[in-house]
A protein has these predicted regions:
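N-terminal nucleophile
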Residues: 1-426
Length: 426
């Protein structure tokens, strides 16, 4: 986006299960209002608490009517209020228990993995089966690792669900743990149940979330904005979500490009390298340094200096990684954003569509776990302060010629942001 407008583009691929099937017919880009210049892109999960997100968004759009807000952030707040006020309509209460189960089961899968990995590693080192005492140590250590993992997860601000989860689900959680980990001691069981109940107050969305990127203008917004939300679920009438990022065009920030969902290809285009490679460099080099130094005889170092050498090399590695990031921003990203700042609206839309296309090409030809997960028709829209939400490309599952009633029913509200019925589908 730049000072003139924000361009939104989304593909149509949706994955069923673990690559059991891929359909290229999903709708991911929507106008949030029939009148105001606001849109939203969805990604990751297509369902929220068992309800298709598309249905929720269209119900909200219908309920909004001609309502307008001063800022984009107020649209986001109003959407959340709509969800909480219509829990009966969407039957969220019926899906609370399956949602809670999905959260704590996903957490405890990590304990299973840690426990099994530790046993295999220890047996490989010892070249024999482990004794009961050795197993007990590994079991306790695995529980402690899970407790530490939970403790290190940042809290979700303003959320207090622990007492409700303890009162409603602690017995169920306790039964699940004792069934799957019959070896657990009473002391470890109590600590693990308590930690599991507290996970609902923390930023733990590993079981899945709905990605929502709200974009556009409030009445008092002169430049475009984007508010990027991860929405996990509703428990006891409270929303589990966090704001991933907020992007605004200002007098000093002239342009920005914000990849969503599968970001690796777009990051490579923008930076010359993607986050996963940078993180891998940051992990692998210190590990190689540690292994190499351990192989060097202690006599080559002055007394007490071996650890200092390793720490200094790790510091140099961290500095090198930061230097790579800065160079990528300077040599790759900055020239592109400088160009985006001056792009006319139609070129802005073409760039947004091209970002999806290059990712789609990569997913189509690369034989990896993500093959085919981006593809199908691309929906493209432009939102500007003066013209509002304008579709440039939009797929329909039906033929327009046979369904004129659809378009007439969607164009009953007249607005300066919209043209005639034939030119601007909502």
């Amino acid at each position: 986006m730049n000072k003139n407008a924000i361009a939104l583009a989304a593909d149509s691929a949706v994955t069923i299960g673990k690559h059991l099937a891929i359909h290229n017919s999903a709708n991911k880009l929507f106008a949030l209002s029939k009148i105001e210049p606001v849109g939203v892109i969805i990604y990751s999960n297509a369902d929220f608490m068992g309800i298709p997100v598309e249905i929720i968004l269209k119900q909200y759009k219908s309920a909004m009517g001609d309502k307008a807000f001063n800022t984009l952030e107020e649209y986001v707040s109003d959407f959340f209020a709509f969800l909480l006020q219509h829990t009966e309509l969407f039957h969220f209460h019926n899906n609370e228990k399956p949602y809670v189960q999905s959260v704590y089961i996903d957490l405890l899968k990590g304990l299973t993995g840690d426990y099994q990995h530790s046993i295999k590693k220890k047996e490989s080192e010892m070249q024999r089966n482990l004794t009961p005492d050795e197993l007990a140590i590994i079991q306790h250590d695995a529980v402690c690792a899970t407790l530490k993992f939970v403790d290190n997860i940042p809290p979700l601000p303003g959320l207090d669900l622990t007492h409700y989860i303890e009162a409603t689900y602690s017995h169920e959680i306790c039964e699940h743990i004792t069934h799957n980990f019959p070896w657990i001691t009473a002391e470890d069981l109590a600590a693990l149940v308590k930690a599991t109940c507290s996970i609902f107050n923390r930023l733990f969305f590993r079981n899945g979330y709905v990605g929502l990127a709200f974009a556009g203008y409030g009445k008092n917004d002169i430049f475009p904005k984007m508010v990027h939300i991860h929405l996990s679920g509703i428990v006891n009438g409270k929303m589990r979500y966090y704001q991933k990022e907020r992007v605004s065009i200002t007098e000093s920030q002239n342009a920005t490009i914000t990849p969503l969902a599968q970001t690796d290809v777009m990051q490579t285009f923008l930076f010359g390298i993607n986050d996963s490679f940078i993180q891998e460099i940051g992990r692998e080099i210190p590990l190689q340094i540690a292994n190499s130094i351990q192989k060097v005889d202690d006599t080559f170092f002055a007394e007490g200096k071996k650890q200092n050498v390793q720490q200094e090399l790790n510091t140099i590695t961290t500095g090198t990684v930061q230097s790579i990031i800065q160079k990528a921003q300077r040599q790759y990203l900055r020239p592109i954003t400088q160009s985006v700042a001056t792009l006319p609206i139609e070129e802005l839309a073409l760039l947004a569509e091209s970002m999806i296309n290059i990712t789609s090409i990569r997913r189509r030809v690369a034989i990896d776990d993500n093959i085919g997960t981006v593809g199908g028709p691309i929906d493209v829209a432009i939102i500007s302060k003066c013209d509002g939400f304008i579709w440039l490309k939009r797929k329909h599952y039906f033929d327009r010629a046979y369904n004129p009633q659809y378009f007439y029913s969607h164009y009953m509200i007249k607005s300066p942001n919209y043209g005639d019925l034939d030119n601007n589908p909502v």
